[in-house]
């Protein structure tokens, strides 16, 4: 697994050796150089892959073991997932891996020997993200050669007893119970981290405020950095990053590179059309900054331009030497500072201030005082030193705030049935190296668990995969044009159709070698479901480039349909219900509501405004935030009528809030929800001003791309 680690990824051995008393031998750099020199040789890649199968230095298992016919489901293809898959394949097991992200097929024949690896490599600035590798793909910056991910894929995909399914997530397209029913002998959780932590301060949801996960996933996995990309992500300078871990450093360096690319691309393609006053101000700002970058003749002048514009600054609540970034990999901190990123210590965020457009304009910080551990005997060595907010505050001007303050592990453990690796295992939480270690140290536990059991599936792996291909692969069944801007999209995806409950939705994407034809992740709610035929019907409205591209899909074309995701709608009984939607009825929802003895009325907007509906029990609203807000204010419903809205916020991963883009401010103690997992909400708690503002986060870019 040296292709996944090495220089600037793994430095545990160097740090553990002499604790910085002198310059250590840089073992990871040596390992990376050996791999690099090997790959330069004719058939060097084949030599490396051979050594991953035949390892003469491993005296206990120099060769892969004989086939066991055990079928193991690995859920996730991040560092833990691809490492565990490798060790399980060496143990002789059949490995089927699933990943909720889209994974683009490799552009070359994986079974044909590669003579010169450099002919297959891409420049990192031009490389289209392929989705394989999880956080290794979207969470690590250009400090690491991501072409290595293609090597890791080859190591796995050249095994006849390995198959992966992308756009398939556990608990969505397939459940744990279904996996066991399909004759999997074991399920291994390698699903990575959970939801990002959010600052509990005012205006945390303002325009210009993002989570680090959102920023990195949109940039690296969505390909926002690529020329002509359909992925929109707007950032402005100065940039404030709140946090102190390695992720905050990655965000800081990437934000500088991306900002330059963003404004240069904008200046080249700018057309003034349908712009608001805010759009015009931002456009002038971007064009002026693009000119400054164009005038910079070298890196030193470029660094001066960044400093003039405010640059990127990391703000940490404690001292630099106590920050996770310094403790885990101080070398990365040195590299980051050398690029011109600033690091401010002892800064505790108190409040985010916004301008007249609802966009962040400044952050108020409290300058904290550090309490020396010698004066606090109860201080624990693994805890961050205590910091106490002071009365000293400072106001920092900024136009982008990125929160990199950690993530929550929401995994519910059942060690009797399943095993857990990487970030979803508290023992190995926190880095790529730990994730790989968890697989190396944990695969034998699976082997011991299986040894006394008989394989559940009696046939060959080819037969096993045939049933999975049918159940898990999503293909276009038919496209019916309804009018110029509306069409019906019917997709064949049997297990997804079976698992769907009304109120949930799906994430649709396509595969294309042409980046201009790639569909951004689109959230679609089914209009109807045919479980027997495995068909899911969607009514799609052309409201942007990605939804327009959906119409160009071909029959039998393979697509990514991840889901069903989100929370299902609670189906009541014996109630009077009104569904307010478009003129195209949600046939499936109407049917199931009527089956539960409800009286259902379908209404459109603005026709609904003409009626007095005081006797209605429930109103289900599937419209824009503007219409939903107006309906709430109208006095046409009774006092006890419950108004339920489907919160259509910005979304990206749609995997229970992992990226954090879908954060939505709500009223009450909870303060916010992740709309992709809790999208059906009572209208009373929704902050519509916040929702409408966040939906305009990338407004200017969207107008340009459309």
UniProtKB/Swiss-Prot annotation:
Question: SUPFAM superfamilies this protein is in?
Answer: Nucleotide-binding domain, Riboflavin synthase domain-like
Alphabetical list of InterPro entries matching this protein: FAD/NAD-bd_sf (IPR036188), FAD/NAD-binding_dom (IPR023753), PyrK_electron_transfer (IPR050353), Riboflavin_synthase-like_b-brl (IPR017938)
Name the source's superkingdom.
Bacteria
One molecular function GO term is: oxidoreductase activity
The protein's matches in Pfam families, at most eight in alphabetical order, are given as: Pyr_redox_2 (PF07992)
Q: Which PANTHER family match?
A: DIHYDROOROTATE DEHYDROGENASE B (NAD(+)), ELECTRON TRANSFER SUBUNIT, DIHYDROOROTATE DEHYDROGENASE B (NAD(+)), ELECTRON TRANSFER SUBUNIT-RELATED
Q: What is this protein called?
A: Uncharacterized protein RP006
Traced from the root, the source organism's taxonomic lineage reads: Bacteria, Pseudomonadati, Pseudomonadota, Alphaproteobacteria, Rickettsiales
């Amino acid at each position: 697994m040296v292709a996944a680690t090495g220089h600037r990824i793994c430095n545990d051995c160097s740090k553990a050796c002499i604790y910085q008393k002198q310059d250590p031998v840089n073992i990871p750099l040596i390992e990376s150089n050996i791999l690099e020199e090997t790959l330069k040789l004719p058939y060097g890649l084949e030599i490396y892959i051979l050594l991953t199968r035949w390892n003469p230095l491993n005296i206990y298992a120099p060769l892969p073991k004989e086939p066991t016919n055990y079928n193991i489901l690995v859920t996730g293809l991040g560092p833990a997932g691809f490492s565990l898959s490798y060790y399980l394949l060496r143990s002789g097991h059949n490995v089927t891996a699933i990943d909720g992200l889209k994974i683009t097929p490799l552009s070359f024949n994986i079974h044909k020997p590669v003579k010169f690896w450099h002919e297959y490599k891409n420049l990192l600035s031009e490389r289209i993200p392929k989705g394989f590798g999880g956080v290794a793909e979207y969470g690590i910056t250009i400090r690491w050669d991501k072409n290595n991910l293609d090597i890791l894929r080859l190591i796995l995909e050249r095994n006849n007893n390995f198959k992966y399914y992308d756009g398939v997530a556990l608990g969505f397209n397939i459940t744990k119970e279904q996996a066991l029913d399909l004759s999997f002998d074991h399920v291994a959780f390698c699903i990575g981290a959970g939801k990002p932590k959010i600052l509990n301060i005012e205006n945390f949801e303002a325009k210009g405020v993002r989570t680090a996960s959102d920023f990195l996933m949109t940039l690296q996995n969505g390909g926002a950095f690529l020329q002509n990309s359909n992925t929109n992500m707007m950032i402005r300078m100065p940039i404030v990053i709140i946090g102190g871990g390695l992720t905050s450093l990655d965000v800081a360096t990437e934000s500088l590179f991306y900002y330059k690319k963003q404004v240069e691309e904008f200046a080249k393609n700018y057309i003034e059309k349908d712009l608001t006053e805010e759009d015009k101000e931002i456009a002038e700002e971007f064009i002026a900054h693009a000119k400054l970058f164009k005038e910079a003749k070298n890196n030193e002048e470029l660094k001066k331009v960044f400093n003039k514009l405010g640059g990127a600054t990391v703000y940490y609540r404690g001292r630099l030497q106590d920050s996770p970034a310094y403790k885990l990999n101080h070398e990365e901190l040195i590299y980051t500072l050398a690029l011109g990123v600033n690091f401010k210590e002892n800064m505790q965020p108190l409040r985010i201030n916004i301008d007249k457009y609802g966009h962040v304009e400044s952050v108020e910080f409290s300058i904290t005082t550090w309490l020396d551990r010698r004066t606090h005997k109860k201080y624990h060595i693994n805890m961050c030193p205590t910091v106490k907010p002071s009365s000293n505050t400072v106001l920092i001007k900024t136009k982008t705030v990125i929160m990199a303050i950690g993530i929550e592990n929401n995994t519910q453990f059942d060690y009797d049935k399943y095993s857990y690796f990487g970030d979803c295992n508290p023992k190995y939480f926190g880095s790529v190296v730990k994730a790989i270690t968890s697989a190396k140290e944990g695969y034998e536990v699976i082997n011991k668990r299986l040894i006394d059991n008989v394989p559940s599936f009696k046939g060959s792996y080819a037969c096993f995969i045939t049933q999975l291909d049918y159940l898990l692969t999503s293909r276009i069944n038919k496209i019916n044009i309804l009018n110029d801007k509306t069409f019906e999209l019917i997709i064949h995806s049997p297990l997804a159709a079976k698992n769907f409950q009304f109120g949930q939705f799906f994430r649709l994407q396509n595969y294309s070698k042409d980046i201009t034809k790639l569909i951004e992740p689109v959230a679609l709610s089914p209009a109807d479901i045919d479980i027997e035929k495995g068909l899911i019907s969607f009514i799609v409205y052309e409201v942007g480039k990605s939804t327009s591209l959906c119409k160009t899909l071909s029959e039998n074309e393979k697509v990514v349909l991840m889901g069903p995701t989100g929370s299902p709608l609670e189906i009541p009984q014996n109630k009077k219900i009104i569904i307010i939607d478009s003129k195209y009825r949600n046939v499936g929802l109407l049917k199931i509501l009527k089956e539960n003895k409800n009286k259902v009325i379908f209404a459109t907007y603005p026709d609904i405004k003409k009626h007095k509906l005081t006797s209605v029990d429930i109103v289900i609203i599937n419209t824009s935030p503007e219409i939903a807000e107006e309906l709430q204010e109208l006095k046409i419903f009774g006092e006890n009528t419950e108004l339920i809205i489907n919160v259509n916020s910005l979304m990206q991963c749609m995997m229970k809030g992992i990226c954090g883009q879908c954060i939505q401010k709500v009223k009450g103690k909870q303060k916010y929800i992740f709309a992709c997992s809790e999208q059906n909400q009572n209208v009373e708690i929704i902050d519509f001003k916040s929702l409408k503002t966040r939906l305009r986060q990338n407004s200017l870019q969207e107008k340009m791309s459309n």
